[in-house]
């Protein structure tokens, strides 16, 4: 079953895709991480929603600089804190 996303999530994902298609080819590959920051952003928004996904993406972008070694840094899994009803 396909997961539906909010309008804000769809807009954020669309903006990231525009960056990937229009801006990223002009500046070349610069990301120090796997997956790239833009792919991370899309996955974070899909997994955690617009607000938390944006926060995770912002933290990731702030870590992507020459003084950080980078490497493999996946999106953290969504934790379900709801207790099962008996």
Curated annotation (Swiss-Prot):
It comes from the Bacteria. It is a peripheral membrane protein. It is found in: Cell inner membrane. Keywords: Cell inner membrane, Cell membrane, Membrane. NCBIfam families: membrane protein insertion efficiency factor YidD. Could be involved in insertion of integral membrane proteins into the membrane. Its main location: membrane. InterPro entries: Membr_insert_effic_factor_YidD. It comes from Pasteurella multocida (strain Pm70). GO terms for cellular component: plasma membrane. The keyword Transmembrane helix does not apply. Belongs to the UPF0161 family. This is Putative membrane protein insertion efficiency factor. Pfam families: YidD (PF01809).
